[in-house]
Regions:
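Glycine-rich, aromatic-bearing surface loops/beta-hairpins
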Residues: 127-219
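Short, amphipathic alpha-helical interaction segments positioned at domain boundaries
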Residues: 57-92, 96-98, 106, 119-157, ...
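Short, amphipathic alpha-helical interface elements at domain boundaries
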Residues: 1-93, 202-219
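Short, structured motif recognition centered on aromatic/hydrophobic residues
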Residues: 37-40, 104, 158-163
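A structural motif
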Residues: 111-112, 133
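Short aromatic/hydrophobic-glycine micro-motifs
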Residues: 45, 109-110
Length: 219
């Protein structure tokens, strides 16, 4: 199984290897960092509640991206609020992205070619890992949104993060997103930690908007 942050990044890579424009936005960067934090929570490395993020295991992971995030978390001797980490880790987003892209290349899903990251397989399925074949994230999201089944925890979280990070616009029109709004509400972030992350992302977005407004209209 691929991790949440790997699948988040794959949602931003289109069929010709270019990166979707939405990946350059602050909303995507917040959601991408949020995916790393949720993945750590699912691996029982951290605990997230409305007040703070606590490290509960410092064991080294086999994922270089998560190890970098854990290193940053452990640099603070006292627990910090979720919003703090979403903002603080923005300084590492470029390196977090690079490490995640490299991990996808190492797994034979992407290949680097002239500043682009091309899909190795055209079947929209990931290479077989541990004997299991997994459909690509966009296909799973579309099947969930257009169907009536309850998604897995991972897919529910991924849909919520894609929504918060503006990635749905990469493969759905605005009209389709509006039409699917009720279904999105039904299937997004059924997992508690993911719901807290999405709320914190919204709060950070509002803070960024307020700061931009104040800076453009100084008193």
């Amino acid at each position: 199984m691929l991790s949440l942050h790997q699948e988040m990044l794959l949602l931003a890579v289109n069929d010709d290897g270019d990166i979707e424009f939405t990946a350059g936005t602050s909303t995507f960067r917040l959601a991408f960092v949020g995916a790393c934090l949720i993945e750590l929570a699912l691996k029982d490395k951290i605990e997230v509640d409305p007040e703070e993020v606590r490290v509960i295991s410092r064991d080294v992971d086999n994922d270089a991206t998560l190890n970098l995030v854990m290193k940053r978390l452990c640099e603070h001797s006292t627990p910090q609020r979720l919003g703090f980490w979403l903002s603080h880790l923005q300084a590492d987003v470029q390196e977090i992205t690079r490490l995640t892209l490299m991990s996808l290349c190492d797994q034979g899903i992407l290949k680097s070619e002239e500043s682009r990251f091309l899909w190795v397989l055209s079947s929209r399925k990931y290479p077989v890992i541990d004997g299991t074949e997994q459909k690509e994230a966009k296909l799973r999201i579309m099947e969930t949104l257009l169907g009536d089944s309850i998604p897995s925890t991972e897919d529910s979280v991924l849909i919520g993060l894609a929504r918060a990070g503006g990635l749905l616009e990469a493969f759905l029109s605005k009209k389709e997103i509006v039409r699917l709004e009720d279904r999105l509400e039904q299937v997004s972030n059924l997992e508690l930690t993911a719901g807290l992350v999405e709320l914190a992302i919204q709060e950070e977005q509002e803070a960024i908007a307020r700061a931009m407004l104040v800076s453009s209209h100084p008193f």
